[in-house]
Each structure stands twice: as C-alpha cells, then as structure tokens.
Curated annotation (Swiss-Prot):
This is Phosphatidylglycerol--prolipoprotein diacylglyceryl transferase. Disulfide bonds: none annotated. It is an enzyme of class 2 (transferase). Its main location: membrane. A 1,2-diacyl-sn-glycero-3-phospho-(1'-sn-glycerol) binds at residue 140. Catalyzes the transfer of the diacylglyceryl group from phosphatidylglycerol to the sulfhydryl group of the N-terminal cysteine of a prolipoprotein, the first step in the formation of mature lipoproteins.
Length: 268
C-alpha cells in the first residue's frame, strides 16, 4: 500500500490570507500555457495569433476555465446543495471544478476572442490544444493535495488511505488522471506538432484522447455520492459528459482523414 503524503492544502498563509495549493496549481497551469502558447506564436508561421495577443487570450481562457469550471460543477454535480447553500458557490479554494464545464467556458472564451481579433475559431483551438493538458495535469495535482476525488476502495498495492476517504485504501485516481490526461496527452500532442500534419489533427486528437482517458480513469474513481452510477450500474456522470468529446473528436479525425486521402487537407 502506498502512503498518502498529507500535504497541507494551504501553501502559504499571510495573516488572514490563505494561499492554497489548489489555486496555485491552476495558476501554474495558466502560466505554463501562456509561456508555451507565446513561444509557439513566435515560431509557427501559420499561428492564428500574434505573440503580443497571447496575454489577452490567456485572460479570456482563465475566465472561461474558472467560471465555466465552477458553474459546470454546480450544474452537473451538485445543484441541489448549492441551491440551498448559495454562498458556497464562491468557495473555490475548497475544490469543486468540472473539466467539462471549464471546457465549455474555454470554447465560449475562444469564440469571443476569435471574433475580437478576426481569427478562425477552429484554427485557434488547433493552435492552443497542445498546451491544455498542462493545466489539466496541474489541476489533478491540486485535487490530490486537497485529498479529494479519490478512487474506489482497493486491495491493490497502488491503494492509499486518504484523510477524507475513510479507513480503507483507495486508488489514487487523481494521479492516474494526472498521468494520462496530463503527461501522456501533452506528450502525444506535442510530438505530433513537431512535424507538419493535416490541419485540425491535433484538435481532433485532443478531444478524442482526453475523452477516452477520462472515460477509462472513471472506472477507478469513486462515483460522486449524489449521483452514483447513472446508467447500467457502472456509468458515471464523468463518463456521460466525456462521450460527446469522444464522438466529436472522432468526427474531426475522420474528416481530416478523408480530406487527406483526397489531398484536400492543408498541412501545417
């Protein structure tokens, strides 16, 4: 059995002000995304955005992630609780962010920003997609430090006892998601971007691979107590929300493949 490290969720306290690791992980992901996107804007001739515009894009994306992630969590996962405890909606440091809500928020942010600068929405998504897994991985580390979103009870050597998960060892599903949704997904997308490839290949890969990784990792993650298993006595809310991403990613990849076969797909 693995040992849970018991990291203090508060990274730094200045008088009454507490700075949580959870928030720092989001800031780290946003900063890394800004840095790499700015770098790519300088070296990629097809970039739909100028280096000096990356800061504004980062601001739009950060708002989309925070607002969309929080609103998505409230709507998708715990609406009755927040309906009766509305003040808790603003306690982001206690956790409670939805990737799928954040993804919708980012799509809205992309649409608004693309319209502002006169860029193509899909080109912008293709350009930014390779750096998104960094933020996803950082967020999962924040979940792990918070001791939340732990996995199912297990007798596997990979199990560990979480402070809020009861006395039995559980899968560290946050670390599984960090590895597959963060490290592996970033590595695959970044390697694909090194060489010329069909336009929108990376966008399709991101949506398809993230959806698959999340769907699989959900089998190790403890279902949300307010929902449990929704369909077939095994399908969770996270899996249901991942299916549209898998399907849309597959549609994009098939379209790219067909255009490539017909030599109608531009390489970038």
């Amino acid at each position: 059995m693995l040992q849970y490290p018991h990291i203090n969720p508060v990274a730094l306290q200045l008088g009454p002000i507490k700075i949580h690791w959870y928030g720092l992980m989001y800031l780290l992901g946003i900063f890394a995304g800004w840095y790499l996107t700015r770098y790519r804007a300088k070296v990629k001739p097809w970039a739909p955005i100028k280096p000096e515009q990356v800061g504004d894009l980062t601001f739009y994306v950060a708002l989309g992630v925070i607002l969309g992630g929080r609103i998505g969590y409230i709507i998708f996962y715990n609406l009755p609780y927040y309906f009766h405890n509305p003040s808790q909606m603003f306690f982001l440091w206690d956790g409670g962010m939805s990737f799928h809500g954040g993804f919708i928020g980012v799509l809205i942010a992309f649409a608004l920003f693309a319209r502002k600068i006169g860029a193509n929405f899909f080109d912008l998504g293709e350009f930014v997609a390779p750096v998104i897994p960094i933020g996803l991985g950082a967020g999962r580390i924040g979940n792990f430090i918070n001791g939340e979103l732990w996995g199912k009870v297990t007798d596997s050597p990979l199990g560990m006892v979480f402070p809020t998960g009861g006395p039995l060892p559980r899968y560290p599903s946050q670390l599984f998601e960090f590895f597959f949704e963060g490290v592996v997904l970033f590595s695959v997308l970044w390697l694909v971007t090194i060489k010329k490839r069909p336009r929108y290949l990376v966008l399709g890969l991101f949506m398809f691979l993230y959806g698959c990784a999340r769907f699989i990792c959900e089998f190790f993650r403890q279902p949300d107590p307010q929902y449990g298993y929704i369909f077939f006595n095994w399908m969770t809310m996270g899996q249901i929300l991942s299916i549209p991403m898998i399907l849309l990613g597959a549609v994009i990849l098939i379209a790219v493949f067909i255009k490539t076969r017909k030599n109608k797909c531009e390489n970038i």
